[in-house]
Structures are given as C-alpha cells and as structure tokens.
C-alpha cells in the first residue's frame, strides 16, 4: 500500500513536470528562466533576512534584560534597516512571481487554445461527451490555478523551496542553542539527547503532517468534483443567455429554474462535503498551530530558568524552533492548496492528453477517405455510424456534377446532416470514399453561426479581415434582402439574438455571394424563409456567374423544382438505425 502511494506521488510529480516543461523550453524560455531565477534569489535572500532577524532577537532581548538604553536604540536602528530591506524584497518577490505567472498563463492559454482548435479537436471532444467536461473551464480557470498554485507552492514566500532552505538554515542555529537533554532511566543511568529541541521539532512536525495527510486525503476528490459542478452550473446560465428568446417564447422559466436549482444543488452539496472535511482538518491544524506557539517555551524554559541561557537566547531559540517547525509543517499549512493543486493537475492533464489523442486520430489515416480532385462531388460506398457505434447509413453512393444542384431527402433522423458532416471531413465514424472538386467549399447549416463583434465581421466570417470594397458588401446584403442593415455594418452587437433566424439565413447567403464557392452544401439553410424567398435565393445561386455545384438537404416538396436531381437516402438506411418519421 505504501509503495502504491509513493508511486502515485511520483506519477503526480511527473504529470506536473509534463505540464510545466513546455513553457520553460518554449520561445519565451529566456524570460521564464530569468524571472524564475530572480524569484528564487529573492526567496533565498528572504530566508537570509529571517536568519538575521533571529540573531537580532538575541541581541535585542539581551539588551532589554541588561537595561542598556544606548544598545536599545542601536537595535531599533538595525531592525528598521532590516525591515525596510525585507519590505522591498517581499514586494518585488510577489510582483515578479506574478509577472512570471501571467506570462506562463498567457503562453499555456495560447497553447491549449491551439490544441483545442487545431484539427477540429473541439468538435471531436463534444462528440465523445463525458470524457472531458467543460473544456472552456479548463482553459479559462484550470490554467490560471495551475500556474498560480504551482508557483505559490514551489517558489512562493511560504512554498516548498522556502521551507527547505529555512529548515536547513535554522537547523544549525537550533542545534547549537538547544544544548543537551538528560533523561534519567533509573538503574540504567541517564540518556542524553544532543540538540534535543531539534528532535522535538522534528517529531512534532512529522507527527502533525502524518495526521493531516490522513484526514485530508478526501479533499482531492472533492475539489475535483467542485470544479466540475461549478463549470456545469455556469454553462447552464450561459445557455439561457444564448437562448433567451426561445425560452421566453416557450415560457420555459420554471424548467430553466429547475435546471439551475439542480445544478447549483450539486455545487452546494459538494461544497458542504468540502466544508465538513476542512472543518476536521482545521480542528487539528488550529490546535497544532496554537500549541506550537507555546511548545518551544515549554521545552526551552528549563535552560533559561537554570541560567544556562539569557532572555535573548530563550527568544532566539523559540524563534528558531518556530522556523524549523513551520518549515517542517509545510504540508500541514498548505494541504488545502495541495489538494486543489492535485485536482487541477488531474483535470488539466486529462484534458491535454485527450486533445492530443484526438489530434493524432485526426492526423492519421481516416476510415472515411476525403480527397480533393476531379470535378463536382462523388460519394462511393460510404458507411456512417453514430459515435456509440450504432449504424446509420450503409453503402451510400451519391454524385453531383460540375454546376449541378442535387437535393438529398429522407426521414428526420436518418443521417442527412451526418452525411454532410462526413463530406466536410469532420465526421470520423464510418468508412468509405468521398471525392471533392478542387476549389472553395462552403457549408451553410440550418442555424448560421454569427461570431461576437460587428455585423461586418459576421458577414465576412470566417475571415477576420477582407479587402472587399464596401460596395461589394452592400450589393451582397441588398441581393439577399438585408439592405436595411447596411448602415449598421460596423455596429457591435449580439447579432445572433438581434437577427431573426430568417435574417440569419439571408446573411449566410450573402456570405456565399462574397465567397463564390465551387462546392456549396446547404443543410436546410432556407427553412426559416417563405417559399417565394427561398426560390429567389436558389435561383440567384443557380444563375451565379461562377456556377457552383450545389448539394442541398431539405424536406419541402418545392425544393425539387430548384434542383437537377433528387436522392432519397432512406434506401441506404441501416437496418439497426432508428428513424423518426416526419
């Protein structure tokens, strides 16, 4: 059992190093190592100042005991100088540590955002729901906690490095001041303990650490769960904000309140469990800390009362004992932070490993072979499955020649949208061959995506900038029936809520006019429009000068007249696939 525990600790430290190492070998490594070296240097200097304050206590209290007025003011002057230096050291140690933290967080955030967005990993993550919850929370919060807690626990003012250096710095002082303790053993004589205060501090701290570790272990699991519950609750609030109109039209406030209450209930219940566990830990740590104040005086008083040491020696010894005991009690004083750190490392490490695995899958040979070449579209012997392995479609064959318009129909839920996902290369479940013409591709979903920002940025999405003239943008808006919005192109707003679904679909057709794709895929992209405007937009595309190949998904019977061919893919339905009949 002990060996398994040690193995887990080593695995945890390896995981911390695996997460931390990339930054310190990155392009920002020079600044990272310089800041780290300065922070460590200030940390070591602060320990030196603690040693100087320890010797000052000896001189100061001896001066008081001797009623030396001149010596008193000299010691006050020395203290003032040491205090000023300590203040400057503490301020810059914290400031430079925070500078390192924000640079590290910035680099990690860019790195994780890159992993999340590259190879459409964000999409594959949501297909395998349950394996990695709330990736947004892991990027925004867990990275922040990882950098701040790692630096705090390792090189911070009360971190591991400070504790180790403080321990060895005061060991010699404590050993030399404590003398020997003679323990009578009756007829066996006397047993002498050299440097007995050091051994008392060691036993005191090790015993306290062992007890704290035993009663605090469940905090790791509880902190891990708390972060997940907090993220789930926050996500439900964001979902309401993004769908305010739909909820209002449904009158869904009671249901939303139930969802919020249930999710927040998990937050509260788990927090109560954390509170109860911390209460148990605090009973022990508060007792341990308070008794540590008087303990060195109890064990040092015999030497002072027998005039073996002066008052200054007593105070110096008590301070040295406190420094050794505090440094040895690092795990006790930091256990809550360590538990949170372990939870963050687990979440962040699992998230990174999952992203890397999905990225490797995406870059490997895909069972659905999507190639660019030839003309139009060709789908050959394509099988499509759901993420859980349930078969959707089998042996799909579909063709669309250059400039042709093909309509794909079928019952709801049969896999029409999944077919378009496979053609776009983002659906990994299945096998077969898809050949696409070389040229621009554009996919229009039923509900267009409108990014945050101005209406102009929504119009040219996914491009961040464009050199298209203003007249070209206005012409596209006018052709799709959005001329009234032309004066508002540079207005920054939440356009996904300001525009109706029909207006959003018109805007997506304006994107088509600006992009001029060779292959255009429409997934019920006109479902919110009336039949007359739907026909108008389709005729506009069919008559476009660049003659795009069009593949549409739709249910309206009027769409057939706007296409050259129609394919009902229900003939490819797998026997095990459940279908909802419209």
Task: Give, region by region, the residue ranges found by the protein language model.
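Conserved "ABC signature" C-loop
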Residues: 448-494
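Cytosolic ends of transmembrane helices, especially the final helix of ABC transmembrane type-1 domains
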Residues: 216, 220, 231, 246-252, ...
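Membrane-integrated ABC transporters
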Residues: 1-50, 59-79, 93, 97, ...
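Extended non-transmembrane interhelical loops and adjacent amphipathic helices
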Residues: 1-21, 102-147, 228-270, 342-355
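ABC-family ATPase nucleotide-binding domain "signature/switch" substructure
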Residues: 422, 458, 491-582
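Transmembrane-helix motif of ABC transporter permease domains
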Residues: 28-50, 66-106, 127, 187-217, ...
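Primarily ABC-family ATPase nucleotide-binding module
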Residues: 131, 346, 352-407, 430-437, ...
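A hydrophobic transmembrane-helix motif
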Residues: 38-41, 45, 54, 159-187, ...
């Amino acid at each position: 059992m002990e060996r398994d525990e040690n193995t887990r600790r080593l695995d945890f430290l390896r995981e911390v190093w695996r997460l931390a190492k990339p930054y310190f070998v990155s392009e920002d490594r020079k600044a990272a190592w310089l800041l780290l070296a300065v922070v460590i240097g200030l940390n070591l200097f602060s320990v030196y100042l603690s040693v100087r304050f320890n010797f000052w206590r000896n001189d100061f209290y001896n001066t008081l005991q001797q009623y030396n007025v001149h010596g008193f003011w000299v010691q006050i002057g020395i203290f003032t100088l040491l205090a000023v230096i300590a203040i400057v050291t503490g301020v810059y140690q914290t400031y430079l540590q925070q500078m390192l933290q924000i640079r590290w967080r910035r680099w990690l955030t860019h790195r994780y955002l890159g992993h999340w967005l590259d190879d459409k990993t964000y999409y594959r993550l949501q297909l395998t729901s349950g394996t990695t919850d709330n990736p947004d929370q892991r990027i925004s919060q867990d990275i922040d906690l990882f950098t701040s807690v790692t630096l705090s626990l390792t090189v911070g003012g009360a971190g591991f490095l400070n504790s180790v250096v403080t321990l060895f710095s005061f060991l010699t002082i404590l050993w030399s001041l404590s003398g020997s303790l003679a323990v009578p053993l009756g007829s066996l004589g006397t047993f002498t303990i050299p440097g007995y205060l050091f051994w008392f501090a060691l036993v005191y701290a090790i015993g306290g650490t062992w007890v704290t570790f035993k009663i605090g272990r469940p905090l790791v699991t509880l902190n891990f769960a708390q972060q997940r519950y907090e993220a789930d609750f926050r996500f439900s609030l964001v979902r309401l904000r993004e769908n305010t109109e739909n909820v209002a039209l449904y009158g869904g406030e009671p249901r939303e309140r139930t969802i919020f209450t249930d999710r927040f209930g998990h937050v509260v219940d788990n927090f109560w469990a954390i509170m109860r566990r911390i209460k148990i830990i605090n009973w022990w740590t508060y007792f341990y800390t308070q008794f540590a104040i008087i303990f060195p005086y109890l064990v040092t008083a015999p030497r002072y009362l027998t005039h073996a040491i002066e008052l200054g020696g007593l105070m110096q010894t008590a301070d040295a004992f406190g420094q050794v005991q505090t440094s040895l009690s690092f795990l006790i004083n930091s256990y809550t932070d360590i538990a949170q750190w372990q939870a963050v490392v687990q979440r962040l490490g699992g998230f990174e490993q999952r992203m890397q695995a999905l990225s490797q899958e995406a870059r490997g040979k895909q069972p659905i072979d999507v190639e660019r070449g030839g003309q139009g579209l060709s789908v050959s012997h394509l099988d499509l499955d759901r993420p859980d392995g349930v078969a959707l479609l089998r042996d799909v064959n579909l063709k669309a020649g250059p400039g042709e318009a093909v309509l794909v129909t079928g019952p709801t839920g049969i896999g029409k949208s999944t077919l378009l996902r496979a053609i776009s290369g983002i659906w990994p479940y299945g096998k077969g061959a898809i050949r696409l013409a070389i040229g621009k591709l554009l996919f229009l979903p039923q509900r267009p995506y409108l990014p945050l920002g101005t209406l102009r940025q929504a119009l040219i999405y996914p491009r961040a900038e464009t050199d298209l003239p203003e007249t070209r943008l206005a012409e596209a808006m006018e052709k799709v029936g959005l001329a009234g919005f032309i004066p508002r192109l540079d207005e920054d707003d939440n356009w996904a809520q300001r525009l109706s679904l029909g207006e959003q679909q018109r805007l997506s057709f304006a994107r088509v006019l600006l992009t001029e794709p060779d292959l255009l895929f429409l997934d019920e992209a006109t479902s919110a429009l009336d039949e007359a405007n739907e026909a108008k937009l389709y005729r506009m595309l069919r008559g476009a000068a660049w003659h795009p190949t069009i593949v549409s998904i739709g249910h309206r019977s009027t769409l057939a007249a706007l296409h050259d061919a129609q394919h009902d893919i229900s003939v490819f339905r797998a026997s095990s696939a459940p279908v909802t009949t419209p």
